[in-house]
Design a protein with these regions (language model features):
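Glycine-rich oxoanion-binding loops at beta->alpha junctions
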Residues: 35-75, 122-175
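An acidic- and aromatic-residue-enriched active-site/binding cleft used to recognize and process polar
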Residues: 119, 180-181
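Mid-domain, small-residue-enriched loop/turn segments at the edges of structured enzyme/sensor domains
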Residues: 184
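Helix-enriched interaction subdomains in cytosolic or periplasmic regions
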Residues: 2-60
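Short glycine-rich or small-residue beta-strand-to-loop segments that form or flank ligand, phosphate
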Residues: 81-91, 149-152, 173-179
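N-terminal phosphate-binding or glycine-rich loops at protein starts, especially the Walker A/P-loop
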Residues: 1-24, 75-125
Length: 184
């Protein structure tokens, strides 16, 4: 069963919109970039027959919100603290993603507090004793030359309440989760 068939057979299981924390009121600090409008969407599939079927059954064309920089943002970069975690199975390019993310956060958004969370979500559970470490453009400068993930990874479910408590204690208001199927 393809994704369109799954969506049509049980639409309540699939959320194609991203929930918002609140209204985005802060001007983006990014300059010289094309911005994404809030109403831009990407089709779930390019197959016209599947799209027609889904549109008839659902009364809408299945699509995702388009990712990318927006004119207005929610979190003020001057006060933002970021955590980056890699979880699930290893997949190619994790260190490239970490490097690119840190560079954009620092150079484009001006964020200065970025924590690398060790060993997946287990790194957010205090009893495991994995201390986070600071990431900056120097610490990720050559990381893309190595395989795997500089942060380490782990599999297995962790207690969501404990994770949220740790994020609150560390004042992390942005958490980037990178990885394979197990990262969600």
């Amino acid at each position: 069963m393809n994704l369109i068939e799954k969506i049509c057979s049980n639409p309540s299981e699939y959320t194609l919109n991203v929930e918002r924390l609140g209204e985005c009121k802060i001007d983006s600090p990014i300059r010289n970039r094309d911005f994404i409008d809030d109403d831009e969407r990407i089709l779930v599939t390019e197959n016209v027959k599947s799209l027609q079927l889904a549109t008839e059954r659902l009364g809408m064309t299945p699509s995702f919100e388009r990712a990318g920089p927006h004119h207005k943002i929610f979190h003020d970069p001057a006060w933002s603290r970021v955590g980056i975690v890699t979880a699930g199975g290893l997949c190619p390019g994790l260190n490239h993603v970490i490097k690119g993310l840190v560079e954009i956060l620092v150079c484009d958004y001006g964020i200065r507090t970025i924590y690398g969370i060790r060993y997946g979500y287990a790194g957010l559970i205090p009893r495991f004793g994995y201390e986070p470490f600071m990431l900056d453009t120097d610490t990720v400068d050559t990381v893309h030359e190595n395989g795997g993930t500089m942060l380490g990874s782990s599999r297995g479910q962790q207690d969501t309440g404990e994770i949220v408590d740790t994020l609150a204690r560390m004042n992390i208001n942005l958490l980037f989760c990178i990885g394979g199927d197990g990262s969600l």
